[in-house]
């Protein structure tokens, strides 16, 4: 079955029923470059909402461990390789992924 991470109550109910010790958040609204360009606000808002919902519900239900997988889109477009967390917010993001990238930054 699927769980809609945009619906806080659904997440809360899932956590109540399943009582996990660990939540791994790897979900994201994605769609490729064309979709990112055409719908940047959707990618920003829905990814932020999912992140807030799953973090908040996990905290409310006292989940012991939480792993948040993010994205290389969080890093400036001209970042040095290998990437390191201190590079986040140090330069311009890739414009075609900006909404998604900002959402991932805000929920990391």
What are these regions (language model features)?
Residues 1-9:
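Rossmann-fold cofactor-recognition segment
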Residues 2-3, 29-31, 73-74:
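Short, solvent-exposed loop/turn segments at secondary-structure junctions
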Residues 7, 22, 49-53, 65, ...:
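Conserved cofactor-binding/catalytic machinery of classical short-chain dehydrogenase/reductase
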Residues 8-47, 57-60:
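NAD(P)H-binding glycine-rich loop region in Rossmannoid oxidoreductase-like domains
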Residues 52-97:
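Conserved Rossmann-fold NAD(P)-dependent oxidoreductase catalytic core, especially the SDR/UDP-sugar
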Residues 99, 103-106:
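Active-site helix of classical SDR
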């Amino acid at each position: 079955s699927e769980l809609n991470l945009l619906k806080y109550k659904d997440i809360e109910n899932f956590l109540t029923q399943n009582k996990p010790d660990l939540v791994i958040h790897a979900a994201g609204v994605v769609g490729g470059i064309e979709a990112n360009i055409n719908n940047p606000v959707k990618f920003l808002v829905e990814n932020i909402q999912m992140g807030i919902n799953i973090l908040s519900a996990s905290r409310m239900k006292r989940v012991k461990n939480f792993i948040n997988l993010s994205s290389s889109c969080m890093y400036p477009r001209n970042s040095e390789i290998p990437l390191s967390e201190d590079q986040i917010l140090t330069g311009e993001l890739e414009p075609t992924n900006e909404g998604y990238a900002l959402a991932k930054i805000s929920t990391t």
